[in-house]
C-alpha cells in the first residue's frame, strides 16, 4: 500500500479538489501547468507521446505507473519546446482529484507540510526517472547522499544512494543519463538523480547534494522541476525518434522477408511442376514467375495456356491476366 495515502496533504485534495472517475476511454494530457492530480484509487498508466496543438499524435510509449496515493504534475509544454508530453490513462474506475498548482505549492511550502510534500514529489520524480532510464543502464562509480560539497573526477558515473538526491554545482558539469548536459552557462543548475538515473561528470566537478526537503524549504524546487521536465523531454525526444527508426527498420525487414519468401515459393513451385521434355520457354515481359507457374500447372493438366497481351495499364492484376489467358 502506498504510504502517501496516509499523507495529510491528500486530505486537502479530497476536500477541495475536483473529483473524476477515469478509465481507458478517458485519457488526458498532463499539459496544464496550473493543475496537480491526486490518484485516490486505482492506478494511472503514464505514456510519453508526440503532441501537436495540445493533442496526442502517433504511438504511445509507456513510461511508468502511478499508484493510488501518488500525484501527477501538469507540465507547461511551451517551456519544454520539444512537442512531447505525458498522456495519463487510468484503469477502469480510477478516482482522481485535481487542485490548482498554486494551491498545492502553498500547501507544500507550509513548514508543517514540508516532509509530506517531499514524499509526494519524490514519488513523481522517481516515476519519471524510472521511465526515462528503464531501457538503458550503466555501471556506477559513486553513490551520493546529502553533503555540503564533494569533488568527483572527470568521467565518473554517480547515482543516489537512497531516494531522490538534488545536485547543484560549484564547478564542472554533468551529463544526465549520458545524453544531455544539465548545466546552463551562467545559470544555477539543480538536478535530481535517483537510483535509476545517473549523472556522468564532465571534467573535475565540485557539487553539493541535498534531499527534496531543502529546495522545498527555500523555494528552489519549482524551477528545478521545470528544468527537470525539460531535461526529460530532451532525452525522450531522442528515445522516441530511435524507437520510430527501429520500427521502420523492423517493418522494412518484414516486407523484404515476405517478398523474398514469395519469390522463393514461386521458384519452388516452378521447379516441382516442370515436366521433363517441356520445350516452351518464355522471354521478355512474359517471363515472370507467376505466369510460368500457371503454364506448368496447366501443362500438367493438359490445358492450353498462352501469354496474355501486354497491357498498357502497368497496374493490371497479373493473376487476372494469367487466368484470363487459359484457353
Regions flagged by a language model, labelled:
Residues 1-327:
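Cytosolic regulatory regions built on CNB/CRP/Popeye-like sensor folds
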